[in-house]
């Protein structure tokens, strides 16, 4: 059985047979610009230390900064994240959005963590990746099992580390304590429209 990234590359091959994009163009889309795996140590509420595996894939930034969500799921793994980053690059290009494709994640069942553990994990992801993030570099967003509150923690951690006072590094954050206008359900509405 193929993994998600192998499936994505099979789709690319099929599209190339139909559209004949050219070998050079296809070669550039076969691998991400960056494929980052990190270990995130988190002090658990019981005093123990647990190490979580995290990812960020920056697939292609030919059209603009990398853009894509961060997912928290017990089955998240690098081939899934690579495939999703590839598809994000394609979606942005097809829709004419001046962003590249990126995706991130952590292998975790967030329902098994306390709010404090979840916050420490989220901040730890940013601590490991802050050098590559930013409004003109890589702009993460919520995805599976991540929330506006998690995006707010991540943005806060980014600003603490870098000293940059920006709200543009992470999208999907609460605005004045409320959910961002239009965010809840926007993916579903977009899918229905497409």
Locate each region found by the language model.
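Short, Gly/Pro- and small/polar-rich lid/capping loops
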Residues: 2-39
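Glycine/serine-rich phosphate-binding loop and adjoining beta1-alpha1 elements at the start
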Residues: 73, 93-194
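Charged, low-complexity, helix/coiled-coil-prone segments
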Residues: 18-32, 59-74, 104, 130-141
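Hydrophobic, Leu/Ile/Phe/Ala-enriched alpha-helical segments that form helix-helix packing faces
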Residues: 12-19, 85-88, 125, 129-133, ...
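Glycine-rich, N-terminal phosphate-binding loop and its surrounding beta-alpha-beta segment
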Residues: 38-110
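Alpha-helix initiation and N-capping motif
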Residues: 5, 9, 78, 147-151
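Active-site-lining helix/loop region of Rossmann-like oxidoreductase modules
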Residues: 6, 10, 50, 187-194
């Amino acid at each position: 059985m193929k993994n998600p990234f192998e499936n994505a590359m099979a789709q690319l091959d099929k599209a190339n047979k139909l559209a004949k994009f050219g070998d050079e163009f296809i070669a550039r889309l076969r691998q991400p610009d960056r494929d980052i795996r990190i270990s995130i140590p988190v002090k658990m509420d019981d005093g123990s230390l647990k190490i979580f595996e995290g990812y960020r894939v920056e697939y292609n930034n030919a059209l603009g900064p990398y853009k894509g969500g961060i997912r928290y799921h017990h089955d998240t793994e690098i081939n899934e994240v690579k495939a999703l980053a590839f598809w994000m690059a394609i979606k942005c290009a097809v829709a004419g959005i001046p962003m590249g494709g990126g995706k991130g994640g952590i292998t975790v069942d967030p329902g098994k963590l306390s709010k404090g553990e979840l916050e420490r994990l989220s901040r730890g992801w940013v601590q490991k990746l802050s050098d590559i993030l930013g409004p003109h570099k890589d702009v993460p967003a919520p995805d599976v099992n991540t929330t506006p509150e998690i995006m707010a923690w991540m943005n806060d951690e980014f600003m603490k580390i870098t000293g940059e006072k920006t709200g543009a590094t992470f999208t999907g954050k609460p605005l004045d304590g409320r959910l961002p206008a239009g965010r809840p359900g926007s993916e579903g509405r977009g899918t229905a429209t497409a």
